[in-house]
């Protein structure tokens, strides 16, 4: 729960911001990390010393539910001559270390990141006649902050967030987010490390899909060229009713060319998925490592979890902590990170140590496998094949309903335990599937209807008997079984 008050209002939950000429004695009573970020805000908004602020009534470090202590809201006049409209500018306080006493973040020194190393910002177009900023963006930022604290995954510029609901709970088409550097806020050196500022940018579903298929930075650049869709400062307009591709159809050609040239930076997603070993009789479950719908999933060993974390760090941090909390209780939202690929794609860890399977969990070669996805996850298979495998990369689905993962690898990926001789291999509940370029092209032809969800009827099955591979697209309810 939060309350709205001027940031300079007295009280234990919202300490007053110091003036530009505050004496050192007063500044010393102010949390140093908070003081440093306020200094950057004062540089940008010298005429707004006490902006409205949404404040967590019970602080996170006192057991409250909201990780952000404060969200300040400023009025930005923009620049009409540069196609930058007047807007509200929201700035968070709490993802970085505000206090330096380990109450929230462990102090690790002044040279590295402060806390998680960043704060969130958001720019919302001001509506005509609007005298005060809406407060819903503060709750949106709290939701993203909860994800960061729960998962310990950080955000980077170019990342995207699949939210699956209008950001303001209206009927808006703006239902997802990209992240980018704030165009005005400069990195701040605090006594507890460096803080950068990442801006949330609201986007339509079609724009999110393009970011997944290509990369977030490319779509952000396109949004900057369309004033109504964001313009130079990427200001979110919740009343925008058209995608950038409807506004300028030529932009789709730039995306298609980018995918063909660059491939996709997205290397993994949290998903509703499962796999079965069809080469093993159903009753023969001794030493079985596959996760079957309707059966109790086996859990990853600690070593397996660490291996998957390390080897897929470039694009997917796999863990057993909650995924992004839903803005709408009826929906479960997922987060997908969009990272730039390294020079050589590999399933090795950062230390260049190849995967060495734990001796107690042997790697098994499988003769035949059955992959199962919900419709949203299945719709990403063409992206996996065209944007990743055809560019010599890998792509991972990490289950959000069990401790298992499915990694597709191309023949050029190093460190994989699936090989051309044994293309299906499992290490515990982690399945790897190696696909040749020829087979990828064949699958893309056969899976073409996955790109037209409006014409899709579930369940849907695809089969390649000569490859002993089957893929099923199933209703969400199949994956929501309490036993799965």
Curated annotation (Swiss-Prot):
Recorded consequence of changing residue 152 to A: No effect on down-regulation of GLI1 activity
> Where is it predominantly found?
cytoplasm
User: Any idea which residues bear N6-acetyllysine here?
Assistant: 303
Q: Which GO terms describe its cellular component?
A: ciliary base; ciliary tip; cilium; cytoplasm; cytosol; GLI-SUFU complex; nucleoplasm; nucleus
Residues that the record marks as modified (Phosphothreonine) are 353
Specify the effect of residue 262 to A: No effect on down-regulation of GLI1 activity
Effect of altering residue 159 to A?
A: Abolishes down-regulation of GLI1 activity. Has only slight effect on GLI1 binding
The covalent link annotated as Glycyl lysine isopeptide (Lys-Gly) (interchain with G-Cter in ubiquitin) occurs at: 257
Related illness: Medulloblastoma: Malignant, invasive embryonal tumor of the cerebellum with a preferential manifestation in children.
Describe its function: Negative regulator in the hedgehog/smoothened signaling pathway. Down-regulates GLI1-mediated transactivation of target genes. Down-regulates GLI2-mediated transactivation of target genes. Part of a corepressor complex that acts on DNA-bound GLI1. May also act by linking GLI1 to BTRC and thereby targeting GLI1 to degradation by the proteasome. Sequesters GLI1, GLI2 and GLI3 in the cytoplasm, this effect is overcome by binding of STK36 to both SUFU and a GLI protein. Negative regulator of beta-catenin signaling.
What is this protein identified as?
A: Suppressor of fused homolog
Source species of the chain? Homo sapiens
């Amino acid at each position: 729960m939060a309350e709205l008050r001027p940031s300079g209002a007295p009280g234990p939950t919202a300490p007053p911001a110091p003036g530009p000429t505050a004496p050192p004695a007063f500044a010393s009573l102010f949390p140093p990390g908070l003081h440093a970020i306020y200094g950057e805000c004062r540089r940008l908004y010298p005429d707004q010393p006490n902006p409205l602020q949404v404040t967590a009534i019970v602080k996170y470090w006192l057991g409250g539910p909201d990780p952000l202590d404060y969200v300040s809201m400023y009025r930005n006049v923009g620049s009409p001559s540069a196609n930058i409209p007047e807007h509200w500018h929201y700035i968070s306080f709490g993802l970085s270390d505000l206090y330096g006493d380990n109450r929230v973040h462990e102090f690790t020194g002044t040279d590295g990141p402060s806390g998680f190393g960043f704060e969130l910002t958001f720019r919302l177009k001001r509506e005509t006649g609007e005298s005060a900023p809406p407060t819903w963006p503060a709750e949106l930022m709290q939701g993203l902050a909860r994800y960061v604290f729960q998962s310990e995954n950080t955000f980077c510029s170019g990342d995207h967030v699949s939210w699956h609901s209008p950001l303001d709970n209206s009927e808006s088409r703006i239902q997802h987010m990209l992240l980018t550097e704030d165009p005005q806020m400069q990195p701040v050196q605090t006594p507890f490390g460096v803080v950068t500022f990442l801006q949330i940018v609201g986007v339509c579903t079609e724009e999110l899909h393009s970011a997944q298929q290509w990369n977030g930075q490319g779509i952000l650049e396109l949004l900057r060229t369309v004033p109504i869709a964001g313009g130079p400062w990427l200001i979110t307009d919740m009343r925008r009713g058209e995608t950038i591709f409807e506004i300028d159809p030529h932009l789709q050609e730039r995306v298609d060319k980018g995918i063909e040239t660059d491939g996709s930076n997205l290397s993994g997603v949290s998903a509703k998925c499962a796999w079965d070993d069809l080469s093993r009789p159903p009753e023969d479950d001794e030493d079985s490592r596959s996760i079957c719908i309707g059966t109790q999933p086996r859990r990853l060993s600690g070593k397996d979890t660490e291996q998957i974390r390390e080897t897929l760090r470039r694009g997917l941090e796999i863990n057993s902590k909650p995924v992004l909390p839903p803005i709408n209780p009826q929906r479960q939202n997922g987060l997908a990170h969009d990272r730039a690929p390294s020079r050589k794609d590999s399933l090795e860890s950062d230390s260049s140590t190849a995967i060495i399977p734990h001796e107690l969990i042997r790697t098994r070669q499988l003769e035949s496998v059955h992959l199962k996805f919900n419709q949203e996850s299945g719709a990403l298979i063409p992206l996996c094949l065209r944007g990743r495998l055809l560019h010599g990369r890998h792509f991972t689905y990490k289950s959000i309903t069990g401790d298992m993962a499915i990694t597709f690898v191309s023949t050029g990926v190093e460190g994989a335990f699936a090989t051309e001789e044994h293309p299906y291999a499992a290490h515990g509940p982690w399945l790897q599937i190696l696909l040749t370029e020829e087979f990828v092209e064949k699958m893309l032809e056969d899976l073409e209807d996955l790109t037209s969800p409006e014409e899709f009827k579930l369940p849907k099955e695809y089969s390649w008997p000569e490859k002993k591979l089957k893929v099923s697209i199933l209703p969400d309810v199949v994956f929501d079984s309490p036993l799965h």
